[in-house]
Every structure is written in C-alpha cells, then in structure tokens.
C-alpha cells in the first residue's frame, strides 16, 4: 500500500506518477479526511488527559469525605465524548485505508507513461521468422489438433471455460509436472494450498479491495463476503507467514505451488481472443 506520509508531503507528485500508469486520482479529499482524522486524535488526546486529571482527584476527595458524584458524571461524559471521537476517527481511517489500498504501486521512474502502445523495445534477440504460409494462432492450432474443445467447455460451464482433450490434456499435465520437477531441483519447497481462502488472504496479498469483483465468492461472515476461490496460488503463498516473525536464519523461504486459478475475467480482450490464460479457470505453477 502507498505510504500515506509521502501522499501528505508530495500529493501532486504521487498523482503524476499514478497517472503514468493510467490511474487518475486527486488526493484533495483524502488529505482533508486525513487532516480531520488527526484533528480528532488531537482532540481525543486532550480529553483523555483531562479525564486522567479528574480521575486523579478521586482518591483525595474520598479521603477528605467530599462528594464525588459530579466528578464521576463529568468523567463519564468525557468518556462518551472520547468514544464518539474515536469512532469517527476509526470510520475516517477505514475510508482512507480502503481508498489508498485500491491504488497501484508507483512505477519506477524509468517506466514510460501510458499503456502498451507506448512500450519501448530495449532489446531483440534472433530474427523474426518469415513464413511462406498463413501461420495459425494457438487457438487455431489447439482446435485443429483436437487439443482443446472450446464449444463443449462453454456448454459445461459457460464462456471462459474449455476442455483439454486427449494429447492436449496430457500436454497440460506434462507441463505442470515439468515445472514442479524443475523447481524441486532448484531447491524450492512444493506446497499444496487450500483453494478456498478468507478475505484477509486477498487483502494482505495486495489484491483487495481493487480486485474484489474479479474473484468468485463462496461465503459470508457477519453479513460481509468472506471466502473466495483462490485466483492464484500466490494469494495463499504470500500469506503463509502472515502475522509471524521469522528469524534471519530461517530465510530465505522459497515456495511454489500448483493450483487451478479461478477468476471472473472481464475486459475487451475476452471478446478479441480465446486464450488459455485469461479464462475463468486455468492451471498455474506459482513461485514466491
């Protein structure tokens, strides 16, 4: 998540960098909320100090036989004011956090602004082949070789689904095993993770709240969507040590996992290309 201190100090610069990634924001409202939150905290601290001063008078008053009823009532009222301020500050803090958590990371200064149309070729290797025939894309090849059945996949599960058939299924499985064997030889630890994860897993992976509508939800807790079918094994792997403190001699941790990935993909590319990555379900070996 972006550093709120930097947003306070350089709001226009952070806006400019985000705009380079196509994310247009204005931090004026966020900064106003942040200032209000800090003002509420200052007011609350002053009231807490006053409450402590009043509470410190109680032993002396009781020792002198003085009536403490009015004092206790004043302390109670101050406590109510503090709670109201804390509740308001917490609500504002959540509003700020939810907004900032949905923003992308700032790009490296060397990254060119804009989309893929502004990409700059830095290096090329080899020569681009020239065919004396019209080459087929991977979808056409998969269909002509009967490796993938798109119509029956759509019949079984709707758009964004497909069926690997015959040699296509064997090839898919062979590739998965190839990557598993390769990573094991390189010293990575193989993990099989749950396919159903809680909200915190998506949030701590940096995928929520921005991509909340891109996953499949399967459960609720206290009236809020809570459980998801994992969109990638990364979501689980980066949360394995969530809330833990690892000693230096335990590092590095090198994990990988194979899982199907489930996503509610959307966008123009879905209508332009029937790929085998940007569907609702696809296989992936993920390294973390």
For each feature predicted by the language model, list its residue ranges.
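TRNA-recognition modules of translation machinery and tRNA-sensing kinases, especially anticodon-binding
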Residues: 124-288
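N-terminal alpha-helical targeting/anchoring segments
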Residues: 1-129, 147
């Amino acid at each position: 998540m972006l550093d709120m201190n930097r947003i306070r100090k350089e709001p226009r610069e952070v806006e400019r960098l985000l705009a380079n990634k196509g994310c247009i924001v204005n931090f004026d409202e966020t900064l106003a909320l942040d200032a209000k939150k800090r003002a509420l905290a200052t007011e609350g601290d002053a009231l807490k100090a006053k409450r402590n001063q009043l509470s410190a008078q109680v032993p002396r008053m009781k020792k002198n036989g003085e009536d403490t009823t009015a004092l206790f009532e004043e302390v109670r009222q101050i406590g109510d004011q503090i709670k109201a301020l804390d509740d308001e500050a917490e609500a504002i803090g959540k509003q700020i956090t939810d907004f900032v958590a949905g923003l992308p990371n700032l790009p490296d200064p060397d990254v060119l602004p804009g989309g893929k149309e502004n990409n700059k070729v830095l290096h090329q290797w080899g020569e681009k082949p020239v065919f004396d025939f019209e080459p087929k894309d991977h979808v056409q090849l998969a269909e002509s070789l009967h490796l993938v059945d798109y119509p029956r996949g759509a019949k079984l599960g709707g758009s964004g689904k497909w069926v690997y058939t015959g040699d296509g299924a064997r090839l898919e499985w062979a590739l998965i095993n190839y990557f598993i064997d390769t990573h094991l030889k390189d010293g990575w630890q193989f993990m099989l993770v749950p396919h159903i994860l809680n909200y915190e897993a998506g949030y701590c992976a940096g995928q929520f709240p921005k991509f909340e509508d891109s996953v499949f939800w399967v459960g609720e807790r206290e009236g809020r969507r809570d459980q998801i079918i994992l969109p990638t094994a990364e979501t689980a792997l980066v949360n394995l040590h969530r809330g833990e403190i690892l000693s230096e001699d335990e590092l590095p941790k090198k994990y990988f996992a194979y899982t199907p990935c489930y996503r509610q993909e959307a966008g123009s590319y879905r209508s332009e290309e029937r790929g085998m990555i940007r569907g609702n379900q696809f296989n992936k070996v993920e390294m973390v």
